């Protein structure tokens, strides 16, 4: 118990959960406000503290078998103060992934272990932004506000549909009159009148039908544009972690699902629904003609529905399998094209072709299964339709023979029945499209329902100076992954040049990703000029931080467009000055088109060293106050590197510079060198100071490179 009083696990849990929801928290302030007696946060004070951070919290009692239905992560509250965070529940394996606040590590518990710790009290946590996100999630209900927005257009479509249905009602009546009156009484004058009237009806029906299609296509195209624009904006606003945890081809396949939704919106499905809504009027007229024949039609409708419901789940599973295989093909194709140099260099084209053939065969087989099942579904619909037609023919003929129905009435009845059955059959036949759209909406929802980087309510602060502070930083990429950064405390002064070295996987690049606010630390704060980056607008921050990576991507544009990417209106003089600092001006001037040279896709028209120098110029052109070189010179030839190092004084002047390097000669002139090992800072000092310690890690690495 004493250890519980020394460490307030409730406060620690609040800090972790707040960071998870991108909410900044100052533990000392929370402790001062809510832990008035110094014994730690009790349940009531913990709930008040969480609400003060604009978190939505709710204490509930749940039995263990209901835990897989709650939103995670959640805090499991214990009376002895040894709380823990529940992050995942696997009911199939009867295992529970928790974050142990005492050991500060994730743990997997078996059912019996969890039962021994769980006391039935759990606190559900959500940020207000996440609650709003759930209310605005993308599914079929997303289209309701869009329909309301364009309600005038849809009302016009509805009005046109009413007139079309009235014309559809009049036409059978004309045929009835012709059969029962004109033919019997040889009324040629009446026939002429009916023919003219029917011609007018047909002309108006064609015009209104075309008008309805135009209005409907126009409105759905607007919705399509809005959805497409929303999708791309949302995609670019997603955090780096989203893209790092998914294959490129999988993301592309999900985005392409927009085509399926587009085809559905502009197809016949929705107009068929409108036509079906007017069936009640036709039923009333048909009932007037013959209740018996009408009952046959009525009883056939549940048969259509039952058959579609029976086919649907099987069809959906097969469509899902088809999509998954298509996503695998997309991923493999993107990977193969991206790695074409490696594939050719290693002469592994036959192996890659073999893999592609197998995957393609699997996709084609999945598509064939979908086609077969869809065909079975359509033939089942046709069987019901033909059966109803035969029954109506037999029963209708009996009614005509017995004098209960005239020939004209039978023909009119069948025409009216066709107006009811036709949209039903169309809907049943396009049920496959609806199933596909349902999967498309779900897949697209994976993109649109993923939380974006939080911009709203974040602070856009004045121009930064360049002071950087890491305070008690602890970070891991996933709750169940190893710790990448552990207890990092580091202060970097404005204008200081810092070198960061260490073995691969020691956390060097991760440290700079926290500066760019690509991730929020699990524990601790990253401060720039004393401002917590968890509260800062990411765009405001990144505009003032220049980053050069080991492998930079150039866009398929001109060199000047690539350098001035963040500010297209920048003067040519500034672009040239940045290119000179980066040692790129000379080779650019030798190109035929100079700065207007198109670099090709991902800069394929340039050498690796040339691409790197353009990337350095791109990072310098906006005069950032913080400049990060993450193995930026490792791909340069010695001459290009010499030019960069010669200009390093000008490059570093007036800005804070962080240089990550494996080549220690790159950082030996830095104001301070940070040595990292297994996520911790183990040494720091100037080049000569670190070498003066022969047993230091820096000396060891330097000796290896000297040899």
UniProtKB/Swiss-Prot annotation:
Active site per the UniProt annotation: 83
Membrane spanning residue stretches: 158-178, 191-211, 269-289, 295-315, 388-408
Keywords on record: ATP-binding, Cell inner membrane, Cell membrane, Hydrolase, Membrane, Nucleotide-binding, Transmembrane, Transmembrane helix, Transport
MF-aspect GO terms: ABC-type oligopeptide transporter activity; ATP binding; ATP hydrolysis activity; peptidase activity
Keyword Iron: no
One GO CC term, this protein: type I protein secretion system complex
Subcellular location(s) of the protein: Cell inner membrane
Broad class of where this protein is predominantly found: membrane
Keyword Amino-acid biosynthesis: no
UniProt: ATP binding residues: 502-509
Domain of life: Bacteria
Domain ABC transmembrane type-1 as annotated: residue spans: 154-436
GO BP, one annotated term: proteolysis
Record-annotated ABC transporter domain positions: 468-703
Domain notes: In HlyB the peptidase C39 domain, the ATP-binding domain (NBD) and the transmembrane domain (TMD) are fused.
Annotated PANTHER family: ATP-BINDING CASSETTE SUB-FAMILY B MEMBER 10, MITOCHONDRIAL (PTHR43394:SF1), ATP-DEPENDENT PERMEASE MDL1, MITOCHONDRIAL (PTHR43394)
Leftover remarks: The complex HlyBD-TolC (OMF) forms a single transport channel across the two membranes, allowing direct export of alpha-hemolysin. These channel is involved in type 1 secretion system.
Family (UniProt): Belongs to the ABC transporter superfamily. Protein-1 exporter (TC 3.A.1.109) family.
Name this protein carries in UniProt: Alpha-hemolysin translocation ATP-binding protein HlyB
Gene: hlyB
């Amino acid at each position: 118990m004493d250890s519980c009083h020394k460490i307030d696990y409730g406060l620690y849990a609040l800090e972790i959960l707040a960071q998870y929801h991108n909410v900044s928290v100052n533990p000392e302030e929370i402790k001062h406000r809510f832990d008035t007696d110094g014994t730690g946060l009790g349940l009531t004070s913990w709930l008040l503290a969480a609400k003060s951070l604009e978190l939505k919290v709710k204490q509930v009692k749940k039995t263990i078998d209901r835990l897989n239905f709650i939103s995670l992560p959640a805090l499991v509250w214990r009376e002895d103060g040894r709380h823990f965070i529940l992050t995942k529940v696997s009911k199939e394996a009867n295992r529970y992934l928790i974050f142990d606040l005492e050991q500060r590590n994730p743990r997997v518990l078996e059912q019996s272990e969890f039962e021994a710790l769980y006391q039935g009290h759990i606190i559900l946590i959500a940020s207000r932004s996440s609650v709003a996100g759930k209310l605005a999630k993308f599914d079929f209900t997303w289209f309701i506000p869009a329909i309301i927005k364009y309600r005038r257009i849809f009302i016009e479509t509805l009005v046109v549909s009413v007139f079309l249905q009235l014309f559809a009602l009049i036409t059978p009546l004309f045929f009835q009159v012709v059969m029962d009156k004109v033919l019997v009484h040889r009324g040629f004058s009446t026939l002429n009148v009916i023919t003219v009237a029917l011609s007018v009806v047909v002309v108006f029906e064609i015009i209104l039908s075309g008008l309805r299609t135009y209005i409907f296509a126009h409105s759905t195209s607007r919705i399509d544009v809005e959805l497409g624009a929303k999708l791309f904006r949302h995609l670019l606003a997603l955090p780096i972690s989203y893209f790092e945890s998914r294959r490129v081809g999988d993301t592309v396949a999900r985005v392409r699902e927009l085509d399926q939704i587009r085809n559905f919106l502009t197809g016949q499905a929705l107009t068929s629904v409108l036509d079906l809504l007017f069936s009640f009027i036709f039923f009333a007229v048909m009932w007037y003609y013959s209740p018996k024949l009408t009952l046959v039609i009525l009883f056939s409708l549940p048969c259509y529905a039952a058959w579609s419901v029976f086919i649907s789940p099987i069809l959906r599973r097969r469509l899902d399998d088809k999509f998954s295989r298509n996503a695998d093909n997309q991923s493999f194709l993107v990977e193969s094209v991206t790695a074409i140099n490696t594939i050719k260099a290693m002469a592994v084209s036959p192996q890659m072709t073999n893999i592609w053939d197998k995957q393609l065969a699997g996709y084609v087989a999945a598509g064939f299964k979908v086609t077969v099942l869809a065909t079975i579904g359509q033939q089942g619909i046709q069987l019901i339709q033909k059966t109803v037609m035969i029954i109506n023919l037999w029963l209708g003929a009996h009614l005509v023979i017995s004098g209960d129905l005239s020939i004209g009435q039978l023909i009119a009845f069948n025409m009216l029945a066709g107006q009811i059955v036709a949209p039903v059959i169309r809907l049943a036949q396009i049920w496959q499209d609806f199933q596909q759209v349902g999967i498309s909406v779900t897949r697209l929802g994976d993109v649109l329902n993923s939380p974006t980087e939080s911009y709203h309510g974040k602070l856009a602060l004045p121009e930064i100076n360049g002071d950087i502070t890491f305070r008690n930083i602890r970070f891991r990429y996933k709750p169940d992954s190893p710790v990448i950064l552990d207890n990092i405390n580091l202060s970097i002064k404005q204008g200081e040049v810092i070198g960061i070295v260490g073995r691969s996987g020691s956390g060097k690049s991760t440290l700079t990703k926290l500066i760019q606010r690509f991730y929020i630390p699990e524990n601790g704060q990253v401060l720039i000029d004393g401002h917590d980056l968890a509260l800062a607008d990411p765009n405001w921050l990144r505009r003032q931080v220049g980053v050069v990576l080991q492998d930079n991507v150039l866009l398929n544009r001109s060199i000047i467009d690539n350098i001035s990417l963040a500010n297209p209106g920048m003067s040519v003089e500034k672009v040239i000055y940045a290119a000179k600092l980066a040692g790129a001006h000379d080779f650019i001037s030798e190109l035929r088109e100079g700065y207007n040279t198109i670099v090709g896709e991902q800069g394929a028209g340039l050498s690796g060293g040339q691409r790197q120098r353009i990337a350095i110029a791109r990072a310098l052109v906006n005069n950032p106050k913080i400049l990060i070189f993450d193995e930026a010179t490792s791909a340069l030839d010695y001459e290009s590197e010499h030019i960069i190092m010669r200009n390093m004084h000008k490059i570093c002047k007036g800005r804070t510079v962080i240089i990550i390097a494996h080549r220690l000669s790159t950082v030996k002139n830095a104001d301070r060198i940070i040595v990292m090992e297994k996520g911790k800072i183990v040494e720091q000092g100037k080049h000569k100071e670190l070498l003066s310690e022969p047993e230091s890690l820096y000396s060891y690495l330097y000796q290896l490179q000297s040899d």
